[in-house]
């Protein structure tokens, strides 16, 4: 969920960040981040020429963080390693303060996948455990995306929020979750790929 930054510092001075409460019942509790378009060639991340990074506020030192680049059109919860292009691992080095964790290439579960056109980033905190820790994260930096917002210039005077390319306002609410979601019924009234979902 979107929440106030628990402790701004020089690493992450943002007013807001993501808050994630790990599900103790899940050994591999995953966060799926669907790119707003297919990813460009990710081979530089495999070779190490480019690095994935994420700002993390974690409860302990030594917690592994994993990113899996995935083709979500073929990957399902039960068919590992199909659809999992490559995995990257980083480890926390401080507790209860922001740090930038760098993730390095750790293998290719499904080497048959192309380096071009990956659709999703799967983010795992402390995988292969059953813990219920709380994490905060922000500023995920990784593969470039061939998305519809490339070259888009926002006009905040007329485009407040369309959940695709315009993000010009913040929302305050008392309960529930407000998320970006796939448009459930694309049509002539609303042709957007994404919309808001409130539960």
Task: Please provide the spans of the model-predicted regions.
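Beta-rich carbohydrate-recognition modules and glycan-binding surfaces
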Residues: 1-199
């Amino acid at each position: 969920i979107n929440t106030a930054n628990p402790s701004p510092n020089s690493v992450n001075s943002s007013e807001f960040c993501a808050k994630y409460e790990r599900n103790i019942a899940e050994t591999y509790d995953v966060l799926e981040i669907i790119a707003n378009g297919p990813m460009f060639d990710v081979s530089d991340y495999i070779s190490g020429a480019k690095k994935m990074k994420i700002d993390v506020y974690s409860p302990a030192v030594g917690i592994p963080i994993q990113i899996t680049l995935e083709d979500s059109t073929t990957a399902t919860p039960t068919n590992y390693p199909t659809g999992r292009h490559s995995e990257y691992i980083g480890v926390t080095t401080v507790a209860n303060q922001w740090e930038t964790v760098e993730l390095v290439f750790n293998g290719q579960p499904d080497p048959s996948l192309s380096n071009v056109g990956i659709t999703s980033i799967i983010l795992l905190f402390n995988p292969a455990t059953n813990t219920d820790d709380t994490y905060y994260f922000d500023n995920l930096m990784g593969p470039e995306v061939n998305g519809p917002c490339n070259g888009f210039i926002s006009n905040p005077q007329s485009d407040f929020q369309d959940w695709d390319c315009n993000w010009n306002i913040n929302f305050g609410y008392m309960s529930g979750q407000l998320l970006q979601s796939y448009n459930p019924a694309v049509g002539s009234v609303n042709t957007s790929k994404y919309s808001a979902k409130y539960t």
